[in-house]
Amino acid sequence: MKIIVVKNASELGKQAFDLLAKAVDEGAKTLGLATGSSPVELYQEIVASQLDFSQMTSVNLDEYVGLSPENPQSYHYFMNQHLFQYKPFKRSYLPDGQTKDIQAECGRYNQILAENPVDLQVLGIGQNGHIAFNEPGTPFDSVTHEVALTESTIKANARFFNSIDEVPKSAICMGIANIMAAKEIVLLAKGESKAKAIKDMVEGPVTTDVPASVLQKHPNVTVIADQAAASLLK
């Protein structure tokens, strides 16, 4: 696991962009993409660049159950706003949050991942060490599955909705085994609130209590953290 500590979020975006551009340059066909605040600066760098994804495929980690792609809180909407409207891919896949058959959708998404092996996967990390919506306790051999959102996640998301009743109660999410199948992983972390998770991921035991700790077993992981997020590392 390679650790790069940077001064601020804009440096983090630049470092992540350099790794992604190198992968594209070396012939990457499929990029694994993330949502949330962690990759925003990376996407800004991509939008400002000459990178061309028109012959490439993207796959996203997750989507809320029950939200349409037009819903501003959906991850489809987030990706369009931050990246796809400026830099379209030949094909972009996200789980279908409006599916009537969640098990079938998980199977469909596993098939997509099998047919489009990820060359570089972008990840963030949660304060409790989760990757995507894989919360503590998720088995390391998990594949795409429905995840019931924790009470704390629902409360944290409530500010984006008119009422807490509108907040999705579950999400469809790539499993840890799907994430580990990527050839290369770049994990981004910003802010003091992520410092303990980064320390546990890098220095702690490999345990399902800290889902991100499984990345210690991956042969090609780069962690890019700002000084606050890296502040507890030895």
UniProtKB/Swiss-Prot annotation:
Gene Ontology CC terms: cytoplasm
Q: What class of enzyme is it?
A: hydrolase
- What highest taxon heads this organism's lineage? Bacteria
InterPro entries the UniProt entry points to:
Glc/Gal-6P_isomerase, Glucosamine6P_isomerase, Glucosamine6P_isomerase_CS, NagB/RpiA_transferase-like
This protein's pathway: Amino-sugar metabolism; N-acetylneuraminate degradation; D-fructose 6-phosphate from N-acetylneuraminate: step 5/5
Mind listing the GO molecular function terms for this protein? Answer: glucosamine-6-phosphate deaminase activity; identical protein binding
UniProt keywords, alphabetically: Carbohydrate metabolism, Hydrolase
Catalyzed reactions per annotation: alpha-D-glucosamine 6-phosphate + H2O = beta-D-fructose 6-phosphate + NH4(+)
- Give the enzyme's EC designation: 3.5.99.6
Gene Ontology terms describing biological process: carbohydrate metabolic process; glucosamine catabolic process; N-acetylglucosamine catabolic process; N-acetylneuraminate catabolic process
* Cysteines joined through disulfide linkages: none
- Active site residues per record: D62 (proton acceptor), N128 (for ring-opening step), H130 (proton acceptor), E135 (for ring-opening step)
What does the similarity note say? Answer: Belongs to the glucosamine/galactosamine-6-phosphate isomerase family. NagB subfamily.
Q: What does this protein do?
A: Catalyzes the reversible isomerization-deamination of glucosamine 6-phosphate (GlcN6P) to form fructose 6-phosphate (Fru6P) and ammonium ion.
Name this protein carries in UniProt: Glucosamine-6-phosphate deaminase
User: What species does this protein belong to?
Assistant: Lactobacillus delbrueckii subsp. bulgaricus (strain ATCC 11842 / DSM 20081 / BCRC 10696 / JCM 1002 / NBRC 13953 / NCIMB 11778 / NCTC 12712 / WDCM 00102 / Lb 14)
Gene transcribed to yield this protein: nagB
